[in-house]
């Protein structure tokens, strides 16, 4: 069997392989989309194919829409040539259930893929045609947080951005300049309204997108490349809105075991490709079942019926509260605790850690006992139900090949949000005392113990990349497993650093507890 418009006409074969098919005609949908595009999406990778495109498929299947999504790729053009074109932009979606079973569906809601490449005149014009259509309601984004960045780690504008600012809309290469160029095309065609919806997994994502686009536009105005009135258009939220959103769904790289299952079921050409930009992508996407998308409901030109596809539409405060619930209480703190202890104990799978009763007790205590009393409740999702799903289904899912080593990356940049916010809430509470916390200090002690780079058996261990790693390891030089007192006098600078934890752990009254835990962890296995 082949994954394509022609291939899915083999309804018997697909039924035998237990793969659900779209309940609409892809060719008709693609034709309708070309006539009147409504939704364009930047970032043609797995989270888009495995989550966002599925939302539109629900609407198409239910007869609530007759158009698809146009996918635009600004970074890796091979995705369009090697994955989209051969398969008529279709994706074989494999949902990975916690009980080990899978659910398969052909997602056909992407009308076409376009390379957002100004050097490819035909493709560039196709994208401009989408942006100049009065019917266009939204442009959404999953380009990763790095996709919005105009500056390098030193705070200097990247060379590509400097060049884009000097050359204007016709020579736009950076993703943010491409977006600005397309907005300029829309402005020239009548300054029609549109919503620019970042769906990347980062706080205040709409603000990040807006700030970067506005910086490019302002440079073009300053350099006399576009009229000042264009800047006024992009700056007018009644015409160009930048809603915030919260997204949550784990979509790991294509798994070999899934590829084999699909080949055994009779599918051809399921092999992943590694593109010239090092993207690992396949005709299929595997992902967990739980998924959340919360979007600020600000769409000046109308929007698809996303609320009928399981998307929460709400105000900005609710988006922010949902993000805070996830990041400070219900998911991310549990992830970080499992990450540092998983590395120390030699685990390479988060799911395997969830078979360790002590680690399960640790994350349940962090989530339920210490986190929930101060959780931000967004009102649209129950924080307790969210943790129930995280602990009961998501973390133990053996099909999600997430590693503690990956999650341990950049922990110094994360502990202030993931644990510090809860500590601060305890400090300002009339009824709670940070001194009563036990699991959060133990998680922080685990991170400090992890930084030494020696596992629980005394063997050298790789420490994941972190911008503060050299500084932190220098402070901990000489700390030795089996010698608890070797830590004496070496933790003050770390534990008192409010820029790491969001608060000095001395001020919070937790420094002694963390120190005692570190000493206990250093005593040896």
Where do the PLM segments sit?
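Substrate/ligand-engaging "lid" and interaction regions
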Residues: 1-42, 46-525
């Amino acid at each position: 069997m082949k994954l394509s418009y022609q291939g899915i006409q083999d309804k018997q074969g697909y039924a035998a392989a237990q793969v659900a098919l779209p309940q609409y005609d892809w060719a008709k949908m693609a034709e309708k989309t070309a006539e009147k595009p409504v939704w364009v999406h930047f970032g043609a990778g797995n989270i888009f194919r495995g989550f966002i495109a599925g939302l539109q498929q629900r609407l198409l299947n239910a007869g609530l829409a007759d158009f698809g999504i146009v996918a635009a790729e600004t970074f890796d053009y091979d995705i369009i040539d090697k994955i989209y074109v051969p398969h008529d932009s279709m994706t074989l979606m494999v949902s990975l259930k916690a009980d080990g079973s899978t659910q398969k569906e052909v997602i056909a809601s992407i009308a076409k893929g376009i390379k957002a490449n100004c050097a490819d005149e035909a493709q560039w014009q196709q994208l401009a045609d989408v942006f100049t259509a009065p019917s266009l309601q939204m442009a959404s984004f999953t380009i990763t947080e790095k996709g919005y960045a105009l500056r390098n780690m030193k705070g200097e504008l990247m060379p590509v951005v400097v060049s884009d600012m000097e050359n204007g809309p016709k020579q736009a290469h950076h993703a943010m300049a491409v977006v600005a160029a397309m907005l300029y095309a829309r402005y020239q065609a009548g300054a029609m309204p549109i919503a620019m919806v970042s769906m990347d997994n980062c706080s205040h994502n709409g603000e990040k997108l807006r700030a970067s686009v506005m910086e490019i536009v302002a440079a073009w105005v300053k350099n006399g490349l576009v009229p000042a009135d264009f800047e006024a258009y992009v700056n007018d939220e009644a015409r160009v809105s930048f809603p915030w959103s919260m997204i949550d769904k784990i979509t790991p790289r294509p798994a070999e075991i899934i590829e084999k299952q699909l080949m055994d079921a009779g599918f051809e050409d399921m092999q992943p490709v590694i593109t010239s930009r090092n993207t690992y992508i396949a005709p299929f996407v595997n992902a967990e079942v739980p998924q959340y998308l919360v979007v600020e409901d600000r769409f000046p030109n109308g929007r698809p019926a996303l609320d009928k596809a399981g998307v929460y539409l709400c105000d900005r405060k609710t988006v922010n509260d949902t993000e805070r619930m996830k990041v400070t209480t219900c998911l991310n703190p549990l992830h970080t605790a499992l990450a540092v202890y998983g590395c120390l104990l030699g685990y390479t799978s988060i799911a395997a850690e969830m078979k360790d009763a002590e680690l399960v007790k640790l994350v349940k205590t962090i989530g339920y006992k210490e986190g929930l009393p101060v959780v931000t409740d967004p009102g649209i999702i129950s924080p307790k139900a969210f943790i129930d799903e995280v602990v009961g289904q998501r973390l133990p899912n053996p099909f999600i090949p997430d590693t503690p080593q990956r999650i341990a990356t950049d922990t110094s940049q994360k502990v202030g949000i993931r644990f510090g916010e809860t500590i601060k809430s305890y400090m300002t509470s009339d009824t709670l005392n940070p001194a009563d916390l036990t699991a959060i200090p133990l998680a922080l002690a685990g991170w400090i113990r992890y930084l030494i780079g020696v596992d629980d058996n005394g063997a050298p261990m790789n420490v994941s990349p972190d911008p503060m790693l050299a500084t932190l390891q220098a402070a901990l030089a000489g700390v030795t497993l089996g010698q608890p007192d070797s830590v004496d006098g070496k933790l003050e600078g770390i534990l008192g650093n409010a820029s790491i934890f969001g608060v000095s752990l001395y001020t919070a009254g937790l420094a002694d507890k963390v120190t005692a835990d570190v000493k206990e962890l250093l005593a040896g296995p």
